[in-house]
């Protein structure tokens, strides 16, 4: 009887492994190194995020990104796809939106008129934009934006992450001329974008690589790229300026040895797991319920961190930090509230 059960189980695994197609094609992520971080120094465990106030709880779902006008007006729009990044144009009039399904949009908050600037089908070199994610705008009106994957769409983000997909792109859309330019490709889940205060380089988040790249858009290094910071203690989402002159990085998930094994190593095992489990559930299961945001200086060093180790108030899934000098506002791609954390008592 026991032998029959064992044989049946082995037969099941044989069928799954050899005959059932996998929805992903996992690769060994060997171009970057991950080490389980030590929570010491600027990463010393604290509970600062437990002081966060929940705004609009139950009235919003997945408030991924924020943009603030000169009046501080709160607006809700229902007619959209999945906006993942927002910035006001340099005139402070129109809101430019990176929408995962509709591409780049221009929204007039006063008239509520929505204009499609760059539909996903436009693409580049025959590859449509499958997953427009985040953006920033320079003084000339050029929109720098990321396309997280040339293969997967937003509702398939877990598949891109689990697979180790490196088809992400950094693009420049020159509004004045209508020219579209490829700046970087081969990115591991390209995510947040931030122009430096000097305007000479961009910081581009590679979510699945747990690192941030620097790409020069001006000066003698124009067109070159380098690592700004790597081996972050989790998976970074968006990056925004801090009031102290550095940058805030929202961490969507804290890194552990378990999710390292699950997401980075053993491609054949990941291939098998993708056949057996629902990947969005599996990826969520891999991450601890831990809220974390980081402040970086201009050189990419972590200067401080705010944490919620138990996830009792801010349960991870943080997508963006907006700093107005007195308050941090925390966005999320999954939570049903917008976080508000007072910086000064």
PLM region spans:
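Residue-level detector of Asp-centered blade-edge/turn motifs that repeat once per structural unit
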Residues: 68-72, 88-92, 137-140, 197-199, ...
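Blade/loop signatures of beta-propeller domains
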Residues: 14-53, 164, 290-299
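Surface loop/turn motifs at the tips and blade-to-blade linkers of beta-strand repeat domains
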Residues: 54-59, 76-79, 117-127, 182-188, ...
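Loop/turn-rich, solvent-exposed surfaces of beta-rich toroidal or solenoidal domains
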Residues: 233-311
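Short, conserved, GDST-rich strand-edge loop motifs in beta-rich repeat architectures
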Residues: 25-32, 145-165, 252-287, 340
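Asp-box/WD-like beta-propeller blade repeats and closely related beta-sheet repeat scaffolds
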Residues: 77-81, 98-161, 167-168
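Short loop/turn segments that connect beta-strands within beta-propeller blades
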Residues: 108-112, 174-178, 216-221, 297-301, ...
């Amino acid at each position: 009887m026991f032998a029959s059960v064992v044989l049946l189980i082995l037969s099941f695994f044989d069928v799954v492994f050899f005959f059932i197609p996998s929805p992903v094609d996992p690769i060994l992520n060997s171009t970057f190194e991950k080490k389980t971080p030590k929570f010491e120094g600027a990463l010393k465990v604290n509970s600062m995020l437990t002081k966060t106030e929940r705004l609009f709880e139950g009235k919003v779902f997945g408030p991924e990104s924020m943009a603030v006008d000169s009046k501080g007006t709160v607006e809700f729009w229902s007619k959209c796809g999945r906006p993942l990044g927002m910035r006001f144009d340099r005139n402070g009039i129109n809101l430019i939106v990176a929408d995962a399904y509709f591409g780049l949009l221009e929204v007039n908050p006063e008239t509520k008129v929505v204009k499609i600037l760059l539909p996903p089908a436009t693409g580049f070199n025959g590859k449509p934009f499958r997953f427009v994610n985040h953006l920033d705008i320079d003084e000339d009106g050029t929109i720098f934006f990321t396309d997280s994957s040339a293969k997967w769409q937003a509702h398939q983000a877990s598949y891109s992450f689990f697979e180790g997909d490196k088809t992400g792109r950094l693009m420049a859309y020159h509004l004045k001329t209508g020219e579209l330019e490829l700046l970087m490709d081969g990115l591991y889940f390209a995510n947040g974008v931030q122009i430096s205060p000097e305007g000479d380089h961009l910081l581009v988040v590679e979510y699945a690589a747990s690192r941030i790249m620097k790409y020069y858009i001006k000066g003698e290094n124009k067109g070159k790229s380098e690592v700004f910071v790597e081996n972050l203690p989790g998976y970074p989402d968006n990056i925004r300026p801090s009031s102290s002159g550095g940058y805030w990085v929202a961490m969507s998930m804290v890194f552990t040895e378990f999710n390292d094994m699950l997401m980075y190593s053993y491609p054949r095992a990941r291939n098998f797991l993708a056949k057996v489990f629902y990947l969005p559930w599996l990826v969520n299961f891999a991450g601890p319920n831990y809220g974390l945001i980081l402040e970086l200086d201009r050189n990419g060093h972590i200067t401080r961190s705010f944490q919620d180790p138990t996830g009792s108030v801010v349960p991870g899934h943080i997508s963006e930090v907006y700093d107005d000098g007195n308050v941090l506002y925390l966005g999320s791609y999954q939570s049903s509230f917008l976080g508000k954390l007072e910086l000064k008592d």
